[in-house]
Amino acid sequence: MRKIALKVAYIGTNYHGFQRQPDVPTVEGKLLEALEGAGIIEDPKRARFQIAGRTDRGVHALGNFVSFFTEEDIHVNQINDLLPRDIRVLAWASVMYPFKVRYPLERHYRYILHREESMDTYSMAEAAAHFRGTHDFSNFSRRSDRDPVRRINDVRISEVGDSIIIDVYGESFLWQMVRKMVRALLMVSEGELAPDDMAGLLDTDRRVFLEPMPPENLILMDLKYGVKIKLRHDEYAFKRFISLLEEEFKVYREMSMVRRAMSDHLRDLQEHELD
């Protein structure tokens, strides 16, 4: 019996999060169907199937992990053939029994914003510095979370083309925590908060409501573990997933162009014919 780890990528748009839920499609549910269909596992409990990251509905991933025990050989293409196109196993590894997929040393999330001229990335970076270290993130989570203390290793903000990239690194995260952190940074950029106000939202009993940013812009980029994992990457899986992403990018770009044309036309009508 071997312990196996799979590195999984997915587009979260069509799923109600990663974790299994009754009567709705989830990434974990589709993955288990494929593993059972391929004869790799028969029962998740007997296989001691575990997941690393429970991403929310609409959140995407390029490096989530699962682990399980099996006596069967692993053929990535066999698993991927039974998965929807928007879920891919990118790599696998045989790991030691003590390996615990649920406890990575670091999780890397990336949130992508469309850059507006009014956005002040310098103030955002100044505010983001307050997140580093160990803090009580109660204002960035649900009130029902029993232990809101988390450690953030780093927050990096960069501009790439028309995008602002916010990379957040930490051991673990609360529900909606990253999306609420980004909301606070955006409020700083828009002048609703000062950079130093961020300190007042941390380690405090004063409760402030922060609307989480949309999940569709969030990606779980990767997980790092304390033990070295010899991942066997599948080149064909990479090519197929890249191809799908490029197809979807083209579709969304064309949809954006159509909406822009409609908006421009209505503005023209408003200016010249609705006097």
UniProtKB/Swiss-Prot annotation:
Swiss-Prot/TrEMBL catalytic activity: uridine(38/39/40) in tRNA = pseudouridine(38/39/40) in tRNA
This protein's name: tRNA pseudouridine synthase A
Entry keyword set: Isomerase, tRNA processing
Entry-linked CDD domains: PseudoU_synth_TruA_Archea
Domain of life, source organism: Archaea
Listed SUPFAM superfamilies: Pseudouridine synthase (SSF55120)
Enzyme Commission number(s): 5.4.99.12
UniProt record, GO biological process: tRNA pseudouridine synthesis
Source organism of the structure: Methanothermobacter thermautotrophicus (strain ATCC 29096 / DSM 1053 / JCM 10044 / NBRC 100330 / Delta H) (Methanobacterium thermoautotrophicum)
Pfam families: PseudoU_synth_1
Gene: truA
UniProt-listed InterPro entries: PsdUridine_synth_cat_dom_sf (IPR020103), PsdUridine_synth_TruA (IPR001406), PsdUridine_synth_TruA_a/b_dom (IPR020097), PsdUridine_synth_TruA_C (IPR020095), TruA/RsuA/RluB/E/F_N (IPR020094)
HAMAP family assigned: TruA
Ligand binding (substrate): 109
Active site (UniProt): 56
PANTHER family (UniProt xref): PSEUDOURIDYLATE SYNTHASE (PTHR11142), TRNA PSEUDOURIDINE SYNTHASE-LIKE 1 (PTHR11142:SF0)
Disulfide bonds: none
Physiological role: Formation of pseudouridine at positions 38, 39 and 40 in the anticodon stem and loop of transfer RNAs.
Family to which this protein belongs: Belongs to the tRNA pseudouridine synthase TruA family.
MF GO annotations: RNA binding; tRNA pseudouridine(38-40) synthase activity
